[in-house]
């Protein structure tokens, strides 16, 4: 059983960070029931439920949230929950009749987790946005990319999942801990702009200390330095180099056969371009896999750049079980690891219309009540 075993969480279905937060908590043992609309929302794309991994380890129900009976059912679930997760724009839960005041009147200990991009307050609170917008406004996107080019758009990991889902999970667990002492719930306002700004804490400090330049691609660990970058190999693939410390940089040069080549000091910014060109020339002489073997066993901080199909077979990740194979799919396993109360994927993602009856029964609703709701069209018949 995971370390969060015994926690009960209602998750209002959505996409991106809110369901990912629910997945993290469910993998750690929390009992999470996902509430989907009876009529699926048009998100502009469809994905086979088997591969909708953020919905794993949860039960799911489909409810008519436009009907008073459907809202009453959700209130019934909330009354016995420890926490709620929702990722709608500000005001949507209130319009459904499920705002914090209503829910905490039913359950004073409820921790009400709200996941948004802009936050519950502020002039942009009601505006649409995505990861790229949240990282652009916080100084993050401006700092990513080469010095002579446009900002490079990263995967939607920084805002959605780093600054969003992880901060919501942290906030929920902190509030749940406080509830043990106070007996009172509270609202957790997890805004991606706040989370992303928080992730930039070190960089803002370095900037004001004069250690970091306010220009992308000109710093030690933003791709500006030749010792923290990627290099093209003979077969058109790449190696990643992170030899920041002098002793690691020394091993890098040794393995490249450049230890006695009279190269510039690694921290001589005026000669970074010269050093980078020399490293690039050598890396281009072998294939990625050949270089991987060259650096095996070293502390040069050099690794192959693997794609999502290659990484699942990496020997180190395979030894740790970082990726798991189940039900015909490959997915990242739960993280982090625990010595006694191991996290686990307790169930594969389910289609809510097929799981509704079982999920409600597992939550504690009587069979007669479930039959009544299904007959009235309040829930999916499955």
Residue ranges and their predicted role:
Residues 39, 118-119, 192-197, 235-237, ...:
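Glycine-rich beta-alpha junction loops
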Residues 1-171, 175-181, 351, 355-382:
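N-terminal helix-loop segment corresponding to the beta1-alpha1 unit
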């Amino acid at each position: 059983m995971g370390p969060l075993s015994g926690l009960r969480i209602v998750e209002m279905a959505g996409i991106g960070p809110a369901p990912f937060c629910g997945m993290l908590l469910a993998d750690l043992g929390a009992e999470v029931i996902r509430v989907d609309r009876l009529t699926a929302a048009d998100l502009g794309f469809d994905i086979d439920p088997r591969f909708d991994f953020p919905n794993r380890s949860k039960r799911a129900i489909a409810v008519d949230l436009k009907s008073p009976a459907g809202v009453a059912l959700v209130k019934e679930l909330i009354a016995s929950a420890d926490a709620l997760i929702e990722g709608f724009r500000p005001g949507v839960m209130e319009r459904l009749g499920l705002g914090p005041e209503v829910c905490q009147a039913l359950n004073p200990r409820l921790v009400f987790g709200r996941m948004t991009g802009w936050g519950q307050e502020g002039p942009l609170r009601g505006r649409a946005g995505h990861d790229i917008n949240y990282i652009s406004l916080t100084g993050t996107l401006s700092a990513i990319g080469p010095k002579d080019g446009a900002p490079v758009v990263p995967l939607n990991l920084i805002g959605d999942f780093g600054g969003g889902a992880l901060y919501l999970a942290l906030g929920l667990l902190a509030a749940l801990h406080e509830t043990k002492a106070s007996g009172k719930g509270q609202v957790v306002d997890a805004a991606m702009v706040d989370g992303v700004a928080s992730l930039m804490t070190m960089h803002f400090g370095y900037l004001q200390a004069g250690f970091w330049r306010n220009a992308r691609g000109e710093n030690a660990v933003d791709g500006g330095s030749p010792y923290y970058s990627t290099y093209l190999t003979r077969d058109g693939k790449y190696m990643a180099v992170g030899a920041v410390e002098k002793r690691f940089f020394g091993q890098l040069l040794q393995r490249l056969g450049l230890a006695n080549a009279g190269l510039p000091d690694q921290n001589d910014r005026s000669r970074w371009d010269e050093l980078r060109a020399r490293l690039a020339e050598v890396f281009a002489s072998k294939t990625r896999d050949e270089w991987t073997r060259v650096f095996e066993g070293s502390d040069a901080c050099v690794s192959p750049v693997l794609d999502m199909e290659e990484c699942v077979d990496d020997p180190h990740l395979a030894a740790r079980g970082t990726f798991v194979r189940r039900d015909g799919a490959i997915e990242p396993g739960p993280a982090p690891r625990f010595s006694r109360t191991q996290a686990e994927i307790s169930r594969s993602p389910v289609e809510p219309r097929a799981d509704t009856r079982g999920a409600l029964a597992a939550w504690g609703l009587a069979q007669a009540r479930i039959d009544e709701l299904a007959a009235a069209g309040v829930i999916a018949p499955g």
